[in-house]
Amino acid sequence: MLLLWLLLLLLLLVPLLAILWQQRSRGARPCWLISLQHRVAWGMLGWAAAWQQWRLDRSTLNVGQSQQQALMWCLKKAQGSCCLPREDTDMRTFRNHLPLTQTSHTQEQESEETLPSPASPQYHGDASLQATLLGLITLNKAYPEALAPGSTACVTPTSPWPCSVPWLGHALGRVSPDGAKDPRTLLLEALISPGLRVLEARTAVELLDVFVGLEADGEELAEAIAAGILGTLLPKRAAELKEALEQGPRGLARRLWPKLQVVVTLDSGGQAEAVAALRVLWCQGLAFFSPAYAASGGVVALNLWPERPQGSYLLPPGVPFIELLPIKEGTQEEAASTLLLTDAQREKEYELVLTNHTSLTRCRLGDVVQVVGTYNQCPVVRFTCRLGQTLNVRGEVTDETVFSVALAQAVGQWPGAKLLDHVCVESRVLDSCEGSAPHYEVFVELRGLRNLSEENRDKLDNCLQEASAQYKSLRFRGSVGPAKVHLVRPGSFRVLREALAAFSSSSCRPPEMPRVIRLRHLAQLLQKRVIS
């Protein structure tokens, strides 16, 4: 108990010290003070992380009891009226009184009468705090020098760490401490710091936008650095930036920051494509780490294994309360009843169902996971697809994974092409099927290819037929027309993401990237930027 009180006292004192130290310029602080600040911060962080690790281990050793406690907590804290008794509610009563409901599968919906998400990121709940504290400790163990003072920079206004700890960035001596800043200023701060070991961005797609923008505005940024826009004239660093950019995108991050070890982004739906592009081009040779997986209900899974490249996540038994809805093998139909975490079976696929006290609703997220292992009694999963990102023009179901694999195979047959981004639109959205069979309209942004031949366009349709027997049958009968591929100019998807953010009714939505667009004005936004 005494140790807990000491920890709480430190938690109160360090933010105050960080604010006081922040008032002094970076150059005015003596080295011993910076070192002391860093040691105190890591001491606190280690204590807090050890406490969270103990709580996580205890809860995952008795998952049934932990989930029952989480459910009781949600019922007690539920806002407004509740149709359930607050005490002694078993799972059968819970399921009978609260039917499953749908939540938004993407950031844009045709109907505005959608149910609210059960929680709002950035991000509430034990899972968010655990993801941040345990993620930092895990990252430091994997890369011991990565979080030394001045070794980390975030190039987006929002951090990838789910739980915002205002003093942490200052206490750990980050180049870009937490707090809303202009993205250009954040990038400049990172560029003038050649000793970076960790590069952070909220999501992979946002980091992709940063690198595309860096290439486009590199000359202007170099001039700003040389002119000392951040307070110090740095002509040598400006020359290094120009030289690095002249060598092209492949390996650019390592040329800018020779000591760089790892890229930290927050994983969510639709990020895998951006990660793949970053790995092949700008961030070649670097490790990637995501502390958590964020969905419509906030943080739903923790990453305790930075060494695993596939992205394995632990489903914790706390709040939000998680149920698993089995997916029937070979289809995207769901079973009649949900399961608890203890009932999950290895290699099986499930849709996540979340309940939180904010909105006492059993929300089907649409995020599908496959169980790949266990941590104590809790399932370790891999996120496979989102049910809301399926294509269907004639009753077929082409899910996100099937389409992405087919597209990757097709792009692999386009000489010199690297896929940066894509979205699909069903032809009815653009009224482009008049006089022809309904089909898929596919918009892609590429690197290394400026024009698409008809032969290359046809390869996507061939790959789709190989990937889906149902699609092949419909194509053979003429019920579905060939997929049409459109190449858009660089930066088009950044414009799309800005439009999605403006269209979103809440700034707290998770940073998902839709792969199927169902609103005409968003599809037309890309249509206007087609170059081939």
UniProtKB/Swiss-Prot annotation:
Carbohydrate attachment residues: N356, N451
InterPro entries in UniProt: GH3, GH3_C, GH3_M, GH3_N
Cellular component GO terms, alphabetical: endoplasmic reticulum; nuclear envelope
Expression sites by tissue: Highly expressed in mammary tissues from mature virgins and at day 13 of pregnancy, and at lower level during lactation. Expressed at intermediate level in liver. Expressed at lower level in kidney, heart and brain.
TM spans (from-to): none
Protein name stated in the entry: GH3 domain-containing protein
Localization: Endoplasmic reticulum; Nucleus envelope
Keywords associated with the record: Endoplasmic reticulum, Glycoprotein, Nucleus, Signal
Annotated region described as Disordered, given as residue ranges: 100-123
Pfam families, A to Z: GH3_C, GH3_M, GH3_N_vert
Signal peptide: 1-18
Top-rank lineage group of the source organism: Eukaryota
Entry's family note: Belongs to the GH3 family.
